[in-house]
Curated annotation (Swiss-Prot):
One record GO biological process: DNA-templated transcription termination
GO cellular component: cytosol
Protein's UniProt name: Transcription antitermination protein NusB
Keywords on record: RNA-binding, Transcription, Transcription antitermination, Transcription regulation
SUPFAM superfamilies recorded: NusB-like
Gene name of the encoded protein: nusB
Length: 160
């Protein structure tokens, strides 16, 4: 048995997952607090990604992936929101969703539409897991259904 306490490097996939979570948190903060994209990206890169805050250590994240998601969602929100609204049930408006759910959906839809190099299954699974970190049952199911509908529409493929 090895008692060596050396820190293992975080795998790239895990760094992307951490970047996705941080992007959702940043998008939420922007939505609720009205913070600008440049300010929020600078704050996260300087003080959160891989840093310790109040005794909690944030996972090391792929900073470029984080920037890509946050800036892409902000840049393309007028294109992303109608896709999300169309994928929601008839009686649900995007504005009616919780801010965290909106942030998760916007980030997930951005990746589905703009990151063709990432399989749909990876994107949907990662964002459903993020939803499960914040919510119990209905919201993760909603995230799964909406992202799956949009993936079929945009890429012609469901998650596998």
């Amino acid at each position: 048995m090895n008692d060596d306490k050396t820190e293992r490097p975080v795998k790239t996939a895990n760094q992307r997952g951490a970047a996705r979570l941080a992007a959702v948190q940043a998008l939420y903060q922007m939505d609720v607090g009205g913070t600008g994209v440049l300010e929020i990206v600078a704050e996260y890169e300087a003080h959160r990604l891989g840093q310790e805050i109040d005794g909690e250590t944030y996972l090391k994240a792929d900073a470029a992936w984080f920037r890509s998601i946050v800036s892409g969602v902000v840049r393309d929100q007028v294109r992303l929101d109608p896709l999300i609204a169309a994928a929601l049930q008839d009686d649900w408006a995007l504005s009616r969703l919780d801010s965290t759910v909106r942030a998760i959906l916007r980030a997930g839809v951005f990746e589905i539409t703009d990151r063709k190099d990432v399989p749909v299954a990876v994107i949907v699974t990662e964002y459903v897991e993020i939803a499960q970190a914040f919510f119990d049952d209905d919201e993760p199911k909603l995230v799964n259904a909406v992202l799956d509908r949009i993936a079929k529409q945009v890429r012609g493929e469901p998650k596998k």
